[in-house]
UniProtKB/Swiss-Prot annotation:
Pathway where this protein functions: Carbohydrate degradation; pentose phosphate pathway; D-glyceraldehyde 3-phosphate and beta-D-fructose 6-phosphate from D-ribose 5-phosphate and D-xylulose 5-phosphate (non-oxidative stage): step 2/3
Record GO biological process: carbohydrate metabolic process; pentose-phosphate shunt
Location (main, coarse): cytoplasm
Protein name: Probable transaldolase 1
Source lineage: Bacteria, Bacillati, Bacillota, Bacilli, Bacillales
Database matches in NCBIfam families: fsa_talC_mipB
UniProt-annotated catalytic positions: K83 (schiff-base intermediate with substrate)
Similarity comment text for this entry: Belongs to the transaldolase family. Type 3B subfamily.
EC number of the protein: 2.2.1.2
Alphabetical list of Pfam families matching this protein: TAL_FSA
Species of provenance: Listeria monocytogenes serotype 4b (strain F2365)
Localization: Cytoplasm
Matches recorded under PROSITE patterns: TRANSALDOLASE_1 (PS01054), TRANSALDOLASE_2 (PS00958)
EC main group: transferase
Length: 214
């Protein structure tokens, strides 16, 4: 399973990229707005840092407008992926963009049927949301497993991006469930990096080394 970072914060992206474990970036209008910067400026800076898929999301709701927006996003950089909401209009846009050779990421997926429809429309990626399903008492990991099973049975090339990842356990369970990618906030990566036994082990090694020098 590969890792994307879910943020529009350039400093977080730089830190994660320096550690060598991220293969791409996902953004959305909320994350970009949080940075208080121009969308194109942010995305162009991100593409200069990470050599991998960068998802930029449309803000229109009508297919024709999403297609026009998607074409603009795709022209920013060859690594751009157009992120489109899971609606009928969204799938119509996915079909056209796919036919034009533009990669798409269908977001806000909450059921296996939605994922299957998006895949058949030509989506490069589908993004089921774990945390938001957990919030309403559903099991997002069951959804990941169902989508992975269906895609495997029918040889569907669309990749699964586990989104709305809230904690390290989500990450492990996504990997076990068959997700191709987990897009993870920087704060969750920080939690994944740490373990109290690692810290105490380092402290002991250093203490032993200092004692040996005396």
């Amino acid at each position: 399973m590969r890792f994307f970072i879910d943020t529009a914060n350039v400093e977080e992206i730089k830190k994660a990229n320096r550690m060598g474990f991220i293969a791409g970036v996902t953004t959305n209008p909320s994350l970009v707005a949080k940075e208080g910067r121009d969308f194109n400026e942010v995305i162009q800076e991100i593409t200069s840092i990470v050599d991998g898929p960068i998802s930029g999301e449309v803000v229109s709701l009508e297919a024709d407008e999403m297609i026009a927006e998607g074409r603009v996003i795709a022209k920013i950089h060859p690594n751009m992926v157009v992120k489109i909401p899971m609606t009928g209009e969204g799938l119509a846009a996915v079909k056209v963009l796919t036919e034009e050779g533009i990669k798409t990421n269908v977001t806000l997926v909450f059921s296996a049927t939605q994922a299957l429809l998006a895949a058949r429309a030509g989506a490069t990626y589908v993004s089921p949301f774990l945390g938001r399903l957990d919030d309403i008492g559903d099991d997002g990991l069951v959804l990941i497993r169902d989508i992975a099973d269906i895609f495997e049975i029918y040889g569907i090339p669309t990749e699964i991006i586990s989104a709305s990842v809230r904690h390290p356990i989500h990450v492990i369970e996504c990997a076990k469930a068959g997700a191709d990618i987990a897009t993870v906030p920087f704060k969750v990566f920080e939690q994944m990096l740490k373990h109290p036994l690692t810290d105490s082990g380092i402290d002991k090694f250093l203490a032993d080394w200092e004692a040996a020098k005396k």
